[in-house]
From Swiss-Prot:
Function statement: Component of the ribosome-associated complex (RAC), a complex involved in folding or maintaining nascent polypeptides in a folding-competent state. In the RAC complex, binds to the nascent polypeptide chain, while DNAJC2 stimulates its ATPase activity.
Molecular function in Gene Ontology: ATP binding; ATP hydrolysis activity; ATP-dependent protein folding chaperone; heat shock protein binding; protein folding chaperone
Protein name: Heat shock 70 kDa protein 14
Native organism taxonomy: Eukaryota, Metazoa, Chordata, Craniata, Vertebrata
Location(s) in or outside the cell: Cytoplasm, Cytosol
ATP-binding found in the keyword field: yes
Subunit structure: Component of ribosome-associated complex (RAC), a heterodimer composed of Hsp70/DnaK-type chaperone HSPA14 and Hsp40/DnaJ-type chaperone DNAJC2.
Amino acid sequence: MAAIGVHLGCTSACVAVYKDGRADVVANDAGDRVTPAVVAYSEREQVVGLAAKQSRIRNISSTVVKVKQILGRSTADPQAQKYISESKCLVIEKNGKLQYEIDTGEETKLVSPEDVARLIFSKMKETAHSVLGSDANDVVVTVPFDFGEKQKSALGEAAGAAGFNVLRLIHEPSAALLAYGIGQDCPTGKSNVLVFKLGGTSLSLSIMEVNSGMYRVLSTNTSDNIGGVHFTDSLAQYLASEFQRLFKHDVRGSARAMMKLMNSAEVAKHSLSTLGSANCFVDSLYEGQDFDCNVSRARFELLCSPLFNKCIEAVRALLQQSGFTADDINKVVLCGGSSRIPRLQQLIKDLFPAGDLLNSIPPDEVIPIGAAIEAGILVGKESTSGDDSVLIECSARDILVKGVDESGANRFTVLFPSGTPLPARRQHTLQAPGSISSVCLELYESEGKNSVKEETKFAQVVLQDLDKKENGLRDILAVLTMKRDGSLQVTCTDQETGKCEAITVEVAS
């Protein structure tokens, strides 16, 4: 039985299938192995992918991009606030949830981020079915390591709404290691691996320990000010300055003109990963004036030098944070399309002269291939080269319970610190006045910061209809079990009466 792996990134999506003992990326109907994560709306239809991206110049206010940045977030989230301020589509809050207000010309419609993601997942399913047939719907979906529970849930629900049977959510760094079979090549040895993911909008770094085939995240960091789009923008700004030099007009104040330059710069950026120069041609950039400019790889590297330095400094900072030196890293796995840039690869090689730089798999295909391998494992492919023991076995964030101290102030107790090896079980006793008939256990998540905000609450268990006591306290025993797949099972039991309630929260391993 075949299985599917899907990676939905901020700027692109990719699907791989596991069949006959191997995982391969599937090209879409345009022949591209990576699909732009862009959805364009009109009064008659929704268009996903390259056609939507190409039409954005004409329909910018009805074309949704970077939906992953807002998925599962609230207006109180700083990331959502930044997205809303930059979005060319109007984003509003309705009934406590974020919605896109899309003007198609004929009507105005409200569209949820989850529905946008559903359409992209549907495109991935259609692409996978082109080689597997319509019966194959088992999928593993990747998520960033720093995604919160609400974001993970929204991503999984969007995949389910597209008709996928979601077997598991898997963290992107773990999928990258699975793609290269790290841990299987030396199942009894111990090594440290840096996963370097330069995606469309951010740089995500993870240092992972591989020990006897088991993975553990030691340290991770994400920089939202370094991504592929920033490299593209550096080149687009240069093209704008060249146009101004030649034609005495600054087009940087025109959103339409800059979008044309960004599209041309993106194509050139991709070409410069393999060629020494690239031509940037824009038809009718300003008042009917065409623009033609040749850019060398050396020029591009000079323009992007500050960004290269930021990438390397981010790696150095993570090493210092983890207490490692460059010599402690045995392998570096490259992920994300912009990690193809030759100059960046050379800088990484220079930083880790003793480590192996793994880039034999196209960097923008590594993560979905790893997800497909994991899906193959889960559906029981007897010919798989993998083993269930190589899954990431740690919690991504601190999991806390909320209580009240003697002064009445909120008190948070960390039960599963970030990086806790899985599976794991914790017990927590909650004391409540005997005079009340219901008790609520609230679960929160955090990134290890000193305070926990209300929006980080992700689940609760309520014990109701308890017999009241005139005096004293009642003890409620909470047993929390986080399984290998990252799901969290919570059972609360009144110790006096035995009354209990239980929930299961699906999270990513």
